[in-house]
């Protein structure tokens, strides 16, 4: 036989779950379309009811205290499709998670607010602008800023992976992992081997993975297998196509915490393309950040809040605090990890990005795989370039989603005319999500510049202020630019049909 029986069984398990889910989703979509057209065909009262629903949704959005760009694009969509617009918003645009999820998560977060209290003196050495940004995150996150912390920036997944394995091998107390995508392969096999051994040694090993993000990557008995190995698991927000088509509120975070002393974040998931063991869209360019010291506590609390909302295990987080030597670690500027979620109306991630852009005096360089933003972000980038700031946007040269890439390119002309320099990473797909500005501030994390990351998903990131790795990120961007193609105005020309398609994509951007 060419394939061993276990390989065949594994392949069948993955395909079976994926195929069943896809079939159920298609069945539900078909049923909903049939029901919509059947109910609305010649049914004046049904049409009137849908119009009234759209009217109420419109009034609700006008009064709702949330990002104006997000509201406006939904108001336009509802105005153009009054029969369907209100229902689409309820299905795909409503940022509030399901009531049960919201109640569980908010209860845990309220219980542990004191665990994230800002300690005095952490930001005293910062300039006023940096101190103000840090204060915003600590008050509205709330995630405190920390001295006594160090960081290491990785310009790609294959640079990070050996250090990650080495840190996992050192674990003595606990290992927490939280990822959007976990997929079987070389990367996961290396991690899993260590997790199984550590769990057998009595280390507390826990894994949260997004059920939708990992749908095609894991066998249906994955949780059972992990639990047998004493690795506790939570598939976050399980996919239930016959219950809901909504794919919002995904756990897009990337977090590893080892013993409360070391943490990782960035754009890298646990799948082979992230360390270039598998080629999907050319070379996979990503970024990650390793943190040591007091700042790791923020990541620990982020993880435990998610964990205890769905699998209550402990009320006291104190046993998971960094050890004494970590709390007294060498200081390298200020590090402030933070999370963003759809549980509140605070657009934390977008506000941090806007602050960095608006405060920039010399330069701001941005890595992002997707660019689908509102007028506020667009105008901030244009205004920075117009006042003489060197604004550079680095995007993929080989996209993973063709329509999203076309949507991204629809923003090129206004940005280019304002003086923003745009680059496409020609060797492959750029998946990093990073900002760096003025040798002063940087962010590295999981947050894309699109509606889903900024408003609908659970995300995480780390802000670096006057940290040595700000320069490391800047240098990585400058090394990457020669590998890119700089976009010129002539590259942005399109036909009338293309312009119309771009307009439609802009209108539908919250759904993409």
Question: Model-predicted segments: where are they?
Answer:
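N-terminal localization/anchoring segments of enzymes in phospholipid and broader phosphate metabolism
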Residues: 1-351, 355, 359, 383, ...
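Helical hairpin unit composed of two closely spaced alpha helices linked by a short loop
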Residues: 370-392, 396, 401
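Active-site donor-binding acidic/aromatic loop of nucleotide-activated sugar
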Residues: 422-426
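Catalytic-core elements of nucleic-acid end-processing and repair enzymes
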Residues: 433
